[in-house]
UniProtKB/Swiss-Prot annotation:
Name of this protein: Glycerol-3-phosphate acyltransferase
Membrane topology: Multi-pass membrane protein
UniProt cross-references to InterPro entries, sorted A to Z: G3P_acylTferase_PlsY (IPR003811)
Family: Belongs to the PlsY family.
Catalytic activity: an acyl phosphate + sn-glycerol 3-phosphate = a 1-acyl-sn-glycero-3-phosphate + phosphate
Keywords per UniProt: Cell membrane, Lipid biosynthesis, Lipid metabolism, Membrane, Phospholipid biosynthesis, Phospholipid metabolism, Transferase, Transmembrane, Transmembrane helix
Coiled coil start-end: none
Signal peptide limits: none
GO cellular component term of the entry, any: plasma membrane
Quaternary structure annotation from Swiss-Prot or TrEMBL: Probably interacts with PlsX.
Originating organism: Staphylococcus aureus (strain JH9)
Function: Catalyzes the transfer of an acyl group from acyl-phosphate (acyl-PO(4)) to glycerol-3-phosphate (G3P) to form lysophosphatidic acid (LPA). This enzyme utilizes acyl-phosphate as fatty acyl donor, but not acyl-CoA or acyl-ACP.
Length: 202
């Protein structure tokens, strides 16, 4: 029972819509009505500005990061293969990612999983996250598309999990990559049409 409570708590924390709340609280804006209509960090930068964008990014990363440690902090006990699987920090973090993408608070219309996924990876393997961040910024520097850099970094996480032979990370990163690609399908279409906005600060 406690494992179910832990996973539900992880989902609800992940579902906290940082961009939406900050937009409403400090700017009196519904971020869903501007830019890409997304509640995540990238659209927060576009609509609310850099300070708010950085705050949303931090909060979204933190959501994923903190949930990884729930199995250590909460009184959960694994007494079999199934309970052991669901008390793995990566699996608990996956529920936070699902909450971020499909938040119950906003009729299941949330962000695109990038920052919260980064928080989960930070919690389980900071060195891998550093490598992925370097790849992200290299791709971003070359092509100027946040969406493309995010997808490439996600795919590299799958490859990295194979290299280090972390098979739970492999499963989670593969699922997240699928979600991320699906959530970015409109961005991908705009890239092919030459209509996707490029960043100007790099």
């Amino acid at each position: 029972m406690m494992i179910i409570v832990m996973l539900l708590l992880s989902y609800l924390i992940g579902a906290f819509p940082s961009g939406f709340v900050i937009g409403k609280l400090f700017f009196k804006k519904d971020i869903r009505q501007f830019g890409s209509g997304n509640t995540g960090a990238t659209n927060s930068f576009r609509v609310l500005g850099r300070p708010a964008g950085f705050l949303v990014t931090f909060l979204d990363i933190f959501k994923g990061f903190i949930t990884v440690f729930f199995p250590l902090w909460l009184p959960v006990h694994a007494d079999g293969p199934i309970s052991t699987f669901f008390t793995n920090g990566l699996i608990v973090g996956l529920f936070a990612i699902l909450g971020h993408v499909y938040p119950v608070y906003l009729k299941f219309q949330g962000g695109k999983a990038v920052a919260t996924s980064a928080g989960v990876v930070l919690g389980v393997n900071p060195i891998l996250l550093l490598i992925l961040a370097i790849i992200f910024f290299i791709v971003l520097k070359i092509f100027k598309y946040v969406s493309l850099a995010s997808i490439v970094a996600a795919i590299c996480c799958v490859i990295g999990s194979l290299i280090i032979q972390d098979y739970i990370l492999l499963v989670v990163s593969f699922l997240v990559s699928i979600i991320l690609i699906i959530r970015h399908r409109s961005n991908i279409a705009r890239i092919f049409r030459g209509e996707e906005p490029k960043i100007k600060w790099m």
